[in-house]
Every structure is written in structure tokens, then in C-alpha cells.
Amino acid sequence: MNRTDRLRLWYERAASRWEETLPIGNGSLGAMIWGGAPCEVLGLNEESLWSGWQRDRNNPGARAHLEEVRRLIREERYGEAEAVAEAHMLGEYGESYLPLGSLHLAFKHGPATDYMRELDLEQATARVAYTADGATYEREYLASFPARAILVRLTCSQPRMALTLSFESPLSCRTRADEVGLIIEGQCPEHVDPPYIPDRPEAVIQGERGRRFSARVRVLSGDGTVRARDGRLSVDGASRLVLAVSAVREPELPAGASYETLREAHIRDYRALFDRVELWLGPQKAMPTDRRLAVLREGGEDPGLYALYFQYGRYLLIASSRPGGLPANL
């Protein structure tokens, strides 16, 4: 097998829960790809979308109890030291990381056959392919650090691809549509309780001090007819469509740049990091990744899966943290 065959996660069905989705990211903007047919969902996150606003949440009275806690520790009275610290030295809870929302692609075709989805770790691309109504549909997704955007290429072997694009979010936002794409503008709540504390009446406070944000879904190229209506885009009679998703930061999309050019720049940038390490623990098994995991749980041997798991961890770190952005938050 060549290296590309070794470094991919692939499946013969769409994700049915979040843990099965395919993640892509450029350090600041990420997507979890469900791979549904005919209804695709991209769960979107942006690194700076938190509840709250900039303020000092340290406990000003903590210093007064510091010496007492140190004394109790020196006396090996650790339980008492912990109780004093928890009662008098802790600050307020931190705020909550929030999802940007979901991009929905609803295709108008019949049941899918010959289904496959994959995450290529060598090129940092995700792909979904299947057949429906006698035509072959393919989708490719990548999160480009140079372009500061998520790129989506949709193709159909016949010029009859029809779909509706829409955006949904749990945040307070408004979506507008024109023939160029979708425009999303919103505001994060000024407070959201962390999920690990008990529910209380004011667990979520929208207020006016939360972070404001914007996002765009642009139609970069394609054929067919694109119409905007009621905050959605409708596409009919297409064989090819390229989208760019951006949030908070303006994307770097040179005028006239083709998808292929943007894709090559993405792969070149990503591989400068990913290609620093190789690991070979044996040949790969020619079966979907979820079946390989099931065999391993039943006591089977699959050394190649451990190597894939190692490289998947490296892929996730590259996807979630890049220069100029925030550290990975998980």
C-alpha cells in the first residue's frame, strides 16, 4: 500500500453521532463533517467565540488567606488547606466556549448507494462520494490556513445537482442571502454557565456585552443557477460548485484563484508540518476504520491502526492550533 492509503480514516456510512464526524480545521476555524446524503451538515466552530466580555475574574480577597493555606500544608493538614482555598481563594467560574453554528446542504436526489467518506491525513482533506439517481456525487472539504477559510467543492457527474444551503445557530444571529452567498451577523451571550455546574435560573444571560461576530459563506465558482431567498441559497442544474466559509477574520482569497490553486497552497502549507514525522508499525488492513476498531476491541491485532491513531493525533493538533491564534482549547 502507498502512504496515502495508510494515512486515512474511511467509512461506508454517514456519521450518526458527533464522535463519528470528520474534523477539519485551520487553527482558528473548524468544522465537523457528518457526511449525510442527501442532507449534509457542517458543525462550525471559531476559536474566539466565548460567552462573556473582557474583565478581571480573579478573587481580590484570595491573598489574605494565602499564608493560612501555606501553614496548613506545612503542617500536613491538607484537607483543611483545601477547604480554606475553596472557600476563600477561588475566582468566579470561567465563561463557556460556544459553537458558531451549522451549515446545512440539502441535496435534492434519491437514496444514495456506493457510499464512502474519508479523512485524508496526508493532505488534510475530507471527502464524501456516492451515487444517486444514476449520477456520481462528490464533496471535498479542506480548512486552509493560508486562505483563512474552509473550502467546499461539490461535483456531480451530470449537470443536475440541486441543493439548498442554509445556516442555523444556537447563538443570537441573523442570516441574509444574496447571489454571492450567506452573511451571518450575531452576538454571543454575556454569560453562559459552564456545563459542569448545576442548572440555575440565570444559566444563560444574553445581555448586550457579549462578543459580536460575523461569518460568510461565499459562492466562489460554479455553474447552474443560484437564487437567494429568505436567508437561504438554492442551486439548480449544477455540475460543480465551490464554497468558501469564513468567520471573524477576513479570508485571503486572491482574485481569480481557482479551487485547485487554493487546494495546492493548503496542502503545501499543511505538509510542511505533517511530513516531519513518519511511523510504520505494519501494513494496513483493507477495511473501514470503524470495523478495524471493532476487530481490535474483540482482541484482534492491528499494529497499523496504532500508527494511524498516532498520526491522527498530530493531525488534530495542527488543525486546532496555528501561529497567530489561540492555543487549542481541548
Q: For the regions a protein language model found, what residue spans apply to each?
A:
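Aromatic-residue-lined binding/catalytic grooves and analogous aromatic/hydrophobic interfacial grooves
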Residues: M1-L330
